[in-house]
Amino acid sequence: MAEQTLSFVDCLTSRFPTVRVSVAQPRGEITLDVPVVEWCAVCKGLRDEFDFEQLSDLCGVDYLGYGNAEWDTTGVSAQGFSRGVAGKAVGRFAWGEFPSAGTNDGTQPWDVPQERFAVLAHLISYRHNRRLRVRCFASNDALPIVASLTDVWPGVNWFEREAFDLFGIVFEGHLDLRRILTDYGFIGHPFRKDFPLTGNVEVRYDEEKKRVVYVPVTSVEPRVSVPRVIRDDARFGAAAGESTHSETV
């Protein structure tokens, strides 16, 4: 199985010289990092030349604050959450505020992507019994734009609408890019890391207007009861044995 996986990786790197191929061993999970300008072209090649006839899922990812931790687990801490530790990660800010982009010591983890928003697609080849993950990063964090794959796999239509609704990723060429999960008039994109857990507005009954009205959130304060922790113990040491092989051509 490992030989078949590596042989397939060689075929991918030969056919798509600008992509970065990563393999998680021993599971053999393959991920292709594709330049955003080649997103559609690579996906069409995977469908037509490698028989990935089905796209089973597509989603967005927000890497803001990725790799940040609020609590050091390597030693004894004098600041437990019962003592009101002041965290830096997401979930501790109100509307209009932003989480820290660095770690507690002011550095960036080595594997933090430079771009913030990514689109991931999961592909299946029934003919060859293969699965593949394909990822690309939007080049503009302020307005993330990625080409739509509706011409490649028409079934991706609602997946892209979901990613647009929840993350604000714009899929260029999509013919019906509307919200699909949030309510009419919803403000913001709720799966973004800078979207407050308290929300933007709350509802109450207005005695004068005799109806329910939307008002800015004032009754709820941001509160995190579980710390954001990056663990490094025996359990994760075993998982580290499943090393990732990366190859860039």
Swiss-Prot record:
Q: Name it.
A: NADH-quinone oxidoreductase subunit C
NCBIfam families this protein is in?
PRK06074.1-1, PRK06074.1-4
Origin species? Xylella fastidiosa (strain M12)
Q: How does it assemble?
A: NDH-1 is composed of 14 different subunits. Subunits NuoB, C, D, E, F, and G constitute the peripheral sector of the complex.
From the broadest rank down, the organism's phylogenetic lineage runs:
Bacteria, Pseudomonadati, Pseudomonadota, Gammaproteobacteria, Lysobacterales
Q: In which broad location class does this protein mainly occur, judging by the first location in its UniProt entry? A: membrane
Alphabetical list of HAMAP family matching this protein: NDH1_NuoC (MF_01357)
Origin superkingdom:
Bacteria
Annotated keywords: Cell inner membrane, Cell membrane, Membrane, NAD, Quinone, Translocase, Transport, Ubiquinone
